Amino acid sequence: MLFDNKQMQIMTSGLDALSTRQRMILHNLSNLETMGYKTKDVVFEDVFKNARGRYEVRHKVVTQENTTLRADGNNVDADVESMKLYENYVQQQYLYQKISGQISNYRYVPKAGPK
């Protein structure tokens, strides 16, 4: 099966993690004016093998509690979040290209069996 190799499992799981990060960044930006709102981010911990034998990128959402930029307690910095969004975009594009390359390699695998 196409997604049975370790590299593809890690890349697709990485895309899931980057998708979660993108949602968190957009959530932060949408709460730019919310009093007391604290920035959330996604932390990538490591690659692990789950109980089903599939490799995944472990990630979790964390709240940045110890910084405050404004008197109302909000700590969202639009410039920082915009930069994170761009960085996330570049990482997603890289993984899309790698996955696309892996998939295109399967076109060149000779088909077994009688003609």
Predicted regions and their residues:
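Amphipathic alpha-helical polymerization modules
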Residues: 1-115
